[in-house]
UniProtKB/Swiss-Prot annotation:
SUPFAM superfamilies: Glutathione synthetase ATP-binding domain-like, Succinyl-CoA synthetase domains. Heterotetramer of two alpha and two beta subunits. The keyword Lyase does not apply. Residues 9-254 form the ATP-grasp domain. Binds 1 Mg(2+) ion per subunit. It comes from the Bacteria. It comes from Bartonella henselae (strain ATCC 49882 / DSM 28221 / CCUG 30454 / Houston 1) (Rochalimaea henselae). Belongs to the succinate/malate CoA ligase beta subunit family. It catalyses: succinate + ATP + CoA = succinyl-CoA + ADP + phosphate; GTP + succinate + CoA = succinyl-CoA + GDP + phosphate. The keyword DNA-binding does not apply. One of its GO terms (cellular component) is cytosol. This is Succinate--CoA ligase [ADP-forming] subunit beta. It is an enzyme of class 6 (ligase).
Length: 398
């Protein structure tokens, strides 16, 4: 689960991280009221959407030469003028896709005199099974670009979970970021704070880009992106309250209601599979035969007929889907239950695209018989390779 920048900053500030004074606003009236209470004289007006690249983004409704989704203002009047121009508009960035995202809230904060921009993030390093810091002196840039062009400017530092962030870790991070004097002292305080927040709140990503050194020598969190492990949200009702469903794919929201693991992709072949590993393999073989999956969808090990029907509705809600592949290995999951769900779903949604079903495992013969006796136009497959070839051929022939 993602949250907005202003929410991430509030959370980090609760742990003691240095942030600027700021306020989230939903209207022009709020913007004028609260901007007057900020110290000024420099303000930053920032679009709040779940996507990066906001500063270089463009609003669909405005002139192509208009400013982007992050703007400087030198007076309250300029703040208000920018809010009027930005609020309710559709911001297109490199991460939103061409459809963009509507800006329903803005964050107004004090400006800062910047001396240097740095990059800092925490993530789970699966290679070593630890939370790791990733830092670079090249802040304000796309870290993937830095990794590709100048990897020597990036330090990845895994943290020993039994010791936490040690003084030695702090020294290495400060050296990598070239921090001195007050900035170094701030860094030695900040790194343990961020690690504590990451672990206690079950984050999957904490990214600060940039972390700035101001002209007064101190550090400040200028931008923050935080993602949480969805599987741990039951432990954090306070975090769950920060969820903004308007920023999420409606299909993914509907899937979560039925305990389905769903991720929308950009292809044309819808997939319904049980088990994450099998789902990944299914997507891989679809690509192998020259097509693209439209989604990742894992129905889990104990899906009911109702759950399967819900999965079909979610897949067919995507207008890009030109065919569907159901690939089930019945271990805990019974193939006859899947078959009943498939038949019920096809009848309920009035399926108009090709459907290939591959079943194997528990009660497979009963499952195949249910589909065969249904009289529906379902293409059976003997194995995964056969299923992938059939659905790709059916879609290309459609």
């Amino acid at each position: 689960m993602n949250i907005h920048e202003y929410q991430a900053k509030r959370l980090l500030h609760e742990y003691g991280a240095p942030i600027a004074n700021g306020v989230a606003v939903y209207s022009v009236e709020q913007a004028e009221k609260w901007a007057k209470k900020l110290p000024g004289p420099l303000y930053v007006v920032k679009s709040q959407i779940h996507a990066g690249g906001r500063g270089k983004g463009k609003f669909k409704e405005l002139d192509p030469d208009a400013k982007g989704g992050v703007r400087l203002a030198k007076s309250v009047e300029e703040v208000v003028a920018n809010v009027k121009e930005m609020l309710g508009k559709t911001l297109v960035t490199k991460q939103t896709g061409p459809e963009g995202k509507q800006v329903n809230r803005l964050y107004i904060e004090d400006g800062a005199d910047i001396e240097r921009e740095l990059y800092l993030s925490l993530l789970v390093d699966r290679n070593v099974g630890r939370v790791a810091f990733v830092v670079s002196t090249e802040g304000g840039m796309d870290i993937e670009t830095v990794a590709e062009e100048t990897p020597e400017k990036i330090l990845t530092l895994p943290i020993n979970s039994t010791q936490g962030v040690t003084s030695s870790d702090c020294a290495r991070l400060c050296d990598a970021l070239d921090l001195h004097d007050s900035a170094r002292e701030d860094g030695e305080k900040l790194f343990p704070i961020l690690y504590k927040a990451f672990c206690e709140k079950d984050m999957s990503l904490l990214e600060i880009n940039p972390l700035i050194v101001m002209t007064n020598g101190h550090l400040r969190v200028l931008d923050a992106k935080v993602s949480f492990d969805n599987n741990a949200l039951f432990r954090h009702p306070d975090i769950l309250e920060l969820r903004d469903t308007s920023e999420e794919d409606p299909k993914e929201i509907e899937a979560s209601k039925h305990d389905l693991a769903y991720v929308a992709l950009e292809g044309t072949i819808g997939c319904m599979v049980n088990g994450a590993g099998l789902a990944m393999a299914t997507m891989d073989i679809i690509k192998l035969y020259g097509a693209e999956p439209a989604n990742f969808l894992d129905v889990g090990g104990g899906a009911s007929k109702e759950k399967v029907t819900a999965a079909f509705k979610i897949i067919t809600a995507d207008p890009n889907v030109k065919g569907i592949l159901v690939n089930i290995f019945g271990g805990i999951m019974r193939c006859d239950v899947i078959a009943e769900g498939v038949v019920a779903a096809v009848r309920e949604v009035g399926l108009k695209v090709p459907l290939v079903v591959r079943l194997e495992g528990t009660n497979v013969e009963q499952g195949k018989a249910i589909i065969s006796d249904s009289g529906l136009n379902v293409i059976p497959a003997d194995d995964l390779d056969d299923a992938a070839q059939k659905i790709v051929a059916a879609v290309k022939g459609a």
